[in-house]
Amino acid sequence: MPTYIVLTRLTPEAVKTPGELKRLERVVADHVRKDCPQVKWVANYAILGPYDYMDIFEAPDETTAAKVVMIIRSYGHGQTETWTAMPWERFEIVLPH
């Protein structure tokens, strides 16, 4: 399945209460599991820099990936940027010989 990376920058309101942030994470994760059962979550990272979180997941197609991102954004607590990712060994196949 294709791999997607979502970078999320939280709003200041989202980080005011750590308990609320933990609750929000559980709610979003449950929503994704319920509405996108075919998605395989690979990793979640808190990151330093202009973004607060990096999520890596596999989805069967870009429509499903877009649905995951729309679920994340629907809670109104962050801005996202989404990338597709390709394992290096697959990328090497497309390099000129």
Where are these regions (language model features)?
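Short S/T/G/P-rich N-terminal loop/turn motif that feeds into the first structured element of a domain
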Residues: 1-37, 47-50, 85-97
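Short, well-ordered beta-strand segments in beta-rich or mixed alpha/beta enzyme
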Residues: 5-9, 45-68
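A short linear hydrophobic-aromatic micro-motif
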Residues: 38-44, 80-81
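An amphipathic, aromatic/His-enriched active-site/gating alpha helix that lines ligand/cofactor pockets
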Residues: 59-89
